[in-house]
Amino acid sequence: FGHQIMADTFGGKAEKSQIANVVGARQFDFQGKLNDVYVWHRDQVTGVPPGAQITATAGYCAVGALSYDFPAASVQFHPEYTELHLRKMFELASGYFLTTEDVNAAIASFKNVEIDGKLFAAEAADFFRLHS
């Protein structure tokens, strides 16, 4: 919930998504560059805080990532997740937080995607180098 909490704290708005749980792999547009990422959320940012800029969007999520006018950034997706990690979480959540249909759709979303976890690690490292 970091992305949503940051937006809300700094004057934006976060609320439950119009759609149900969004889990699995989705494509985000990073200012013209498309990347597949792992997602698991229901809440999302719906109002951009003053001084923040949208740096990524998705078809179902207008505020997929934010860059602030101070040393901070936040993302709707989960660069720390791996497919294996999500599959294990799906096993635990099935029947509690997720329906069988949610789990099946999420697993199906992993087909034909290429997720580069190192890309976001490099971006995070660059961010900290720039602001340390």
State where each predicted segment sits.
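Cysteine-nucleophile active-site neighborhood
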Residues: F1-F30, L34-D36
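Amide-donor transfer/coupling interface in amidating biosynthetic enzymes
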Residues: E15, D29-S132
